């Protein structure tokens, strides 16, 4: 659109926390029966957002009218490492959840639906963490939509929906 002179606003979203519910990315029982959160993020931060907040942010962009026209708006409710996500899950679930940081290549080899695509996505987010997080600035996102949920806030409402296998 931009190449044809149409003024647009681009919205950059983040990892949907609902992937823990619907995409089989929630904690699973590992060797010894303990829960493990497996993500190929190493010690890098993962910008995340509740799916319902994406719609709310889009509404806020429309509501802003011409103020955001021609701009790129990144949205995220939180930036958390895999270890921080595992700790939040442990707190909400009331049981130990450890972080299992696979490499993107190991993740692609899991054989689960979408593992290759997710592995590529995670590799990009891991290798370009600074740029990816900066493009989804938490203060700017909250200025746009003050009701954005943090990972912990989303988790407290949705912990019972996450399948623990």
Spans of model-derived segments:
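Oxidoreductase cofactor-interface core, primarily capturing Rossmann-like NAD(P)-dependent enzymes
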Residues: 1-98, 107-114
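Conserved residues in the N-terminal Rossmann fold of short-chain dehydrogenase/reductase
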Residues: 101
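A hydrophobic C-terminal alpha-helical subdomain
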Residues: 104-165
